[in-house]
Structure formats: C-alpha cells, structure tokens
Amino acid sequence: MATALITGGTSGIGAEFARQLAARGDDLVLVARNPDRLAEFATELKERYGVAVETISADLGVREEVLPVAARVASREQPVDLLVNNAGFGLSTRLTAEDTTPLEYGVEVMIRAVLILGAAAGRAMRSRDHGAIINVSSTAGFVTMGRYSAIKAWVTTYSESLAGELGAGGVTVTALCPGYVRTQFHQRASIRTGSIPGPMWVDRDKVVTEALADVAKGKILSIPTRRFKVMIFAARHFPRSAVRAVSRRMASGRH
C-alpha cells in the first residue's frame, strides 16, 4: 500500500489530493499548521475511506519545523511514495512594499520548504528507484504578475531541474500549474476576482484528477484543462514584452 505525504493537506487543493488518494487506498501523512483541523480531517478520512492517516503540525515558514517533516519524508522504515508539496497562500503585498515580511514568509513556505522537502524525497526515492514528487506551482509562474508569479516561476523551474537531476529512472517530478481554482485561496489573500470570467475557473477535483493522471504518465508539467494549456503555450512563445504588458493589465484589476 502506498503512502502519500501532503503539505497544506487540510484545505483547498491539498485536501482534495488527500480525498482522492485516500479513495484509491493510499495511506496519508498530512502536514498543516492547525492541529485541531488536522485531527478533525484525519478522523473524517479514516472513517470514510478506511486508510491510515498520520498528522504532523508544522509551520513550514520556520526552518526548524520543516526539518522533522523532511525526516519523515526520508524515513526508510516508513517510506513515502508520493510527496505533494502543496502548502502555500496568495500574496497581496507589493514587491516595493516597505515591509517585506509577508513576501519573505512566502519565500520560506513556498520556496525554502519545497527545496528542503524535495531534496529529502529525491534522495530517499532515488535510493529505492521509486516514487513521485508533485510540486504545486501555478500558471501565474508563466506570467509576470508580481510576487506570486516570481515564487511560482521558481517552483516550476525547480521541478524541471529536479526531474533532470533524478534522471529517467523510477522517480518522477511533476509541477502542477493550475489556473484559477475554486477554493478560499483568493479571498484569504484579499485578491479581487470579480473581473475573472466564470469559464476561467476550474473545480479543484478536476485539477487533482488531471494531476494524478499526468503523474502516472510521468509528465513533468501538468496544466489542467485545454484552455490553460493554450494560454501557457502562448505565454511561453509570445514575446516577453507582450507577456509583461498583458500581465500588467491583468494585475491592475485585482488590487
């Protein structure tokens, strides 16, 4: 029976990963900050799906709290077959803000923790020649809409680089790059979404279903829905000056 470790595993895309993986019989290790929510969700999953659910309460913005999670990822006695680096949040602080503390915390959670856990998983999985890593990135990483785009551009490039380092063996790395997903993500970051057309939104169950299918195929980039595949193809091939101009217009309507 496989075991999956999911960071940010009690809400949004992370919770959907937990549900779909539990439904197929995988045991889970859930990582999140709120111990009460972890315990509640773990009980729900165990009762509904009959799988084992381990919980780790950790703030991934604190390096000392990331390291025990990395140790669990690297365990030989209880191997992790799938790492889902999902923990993250929206950022409304501008890059030119006088107080960059929120941006620094975003880097700590969505870059440093991803790097530490990805390294631990990569070593452990390579030693067994088996395993998969999903790093939840974003279509925002292909455009230039400020702080979140910058962080997610790193996540995507890092995932491609890690896949290259691990080679063509039994370990895969996938950067999941969803577009606008129906969760509480934008509201929590106070990001206005009224200007985003309804057809641009994607349900999180569809995002996760497509991601797991892409992982099974060994894909390095997973971009859910044909609409966003076309958009990202354009973003990667249009002149960067055009991408920046469009990004500025998109960003101006969200603050």
Positions of predicted regions on the chain:
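C-terminal helical subdomain
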Residues: 175, 195-231
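Active-site helix of classical SDR
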Residues: 118, 151-154
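Conserved glycine-rich Rossmann-like NAD(P)H-binding loop of the short-chain dehydrogenase/reductase
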Residues: 24-41
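Conserved mid-core segment of classical short-chain dehydrogenase/reductases
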Residues: 78, 88-104
